Amino acid sequence: MPRIAGSKKLKRQMAPMFWGISRKSPRFVTTVRPGPHSKQFSIPSAVFLRDTIKLVTTAREAEYAIYHGKVKVDGVSRKSVHHGIGLMDVVELEGVSDIYRLVPKKGHLLEPIKIKSTEKAVKLVKVTSKTTIRKGKTQIGFHDGRSLISDTKVSVGDSCLMQVPEQKINEVLPLEKGSKVLVTKGVNAGQLADVKEIKEGTFVLPKRALLSFGNREIEIPSDLVMVVGKKEPIIQIA
């Protein structure tokens, strides 16, 4: 059987800061394998359990929980210690009452927050692609790697409130003037803002969003924001 490309481990000094790992422990740490989120924007499930939320103390304990199907991401058991957990993913563990959602916070790319059990079956996903396939149907791609064939009218940059793991779209949140957005990357990561204007991209400039943070305004690429509601966030993100 061919070996999956890529190393199973990573030097601790090279790991992203948002993983929350100690730099003075053993030399290597579990890394992310190709999956729903890109390597630089996700946390390996084993690292998440041991270092981020500290529910276990050793890699062996993390492996036991994961291999025995005790860890669910978006309602599906994930049995790989290399599975990448990323933006807006909902994580629950068998026998533990706390449920976590990963969001940007205080300039950090990803941090877990505890959410109510009533929210574990819903997730916000950002539309990253639209493709017309056979018979005129539309395939929609989302930021977490999932895709869906649907007649729902959406545009790239919009967000969808999705039922998981069924992958049913409950509501569409368009990226438009007046939308409430969450900055997902950069120095303003984790901050909520109101969209004042959407500026279409040009040959040399990407699509941009003019955002209001109350007493200040900034203009950033629309790729760095995610719609989370109209006036207020429709799910818990803090």
Predicted segments, located by residue:
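Ferredoxin-like alpha/beta domains used as RNA- or RNAP-binding modules
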Residues: 1-238
